[in-house]
Amino acid sequence: MSKPAPKFLTLTAENVTVRLSKPTTLNGVDQATITLRAPTVKDIRSAGQTSDGDDAQREMNLFASLADIGVKDLEGLTYKDYNRVATGYNFLVQDDEL
């Protein structure tokens, strides 16, 4: 049985929207949420190929690609909000049937 999603997440089969603890600037616009689309195999492979074996950089590249924002925007998040994004990603890719 899977754990229920936290209240700061809005989850669909196609994406997850993460409510940030405070608004932040993403692509030059103040935003209170970040939406990540579901990844493809190509997304996963591309993130790995551009990270030079650095797992943290691979994750940043992947999240930035899925949210259509710059890596620098992700790096500007508070650690609490980055953890919310990572949690959202984990719920998004979780297989409910397992």
Provide a role label for each language-model segment.
Residues 2-98:
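Short, surface-exposed, charged amphipathic helix/loop patches that serve as local interaction elements
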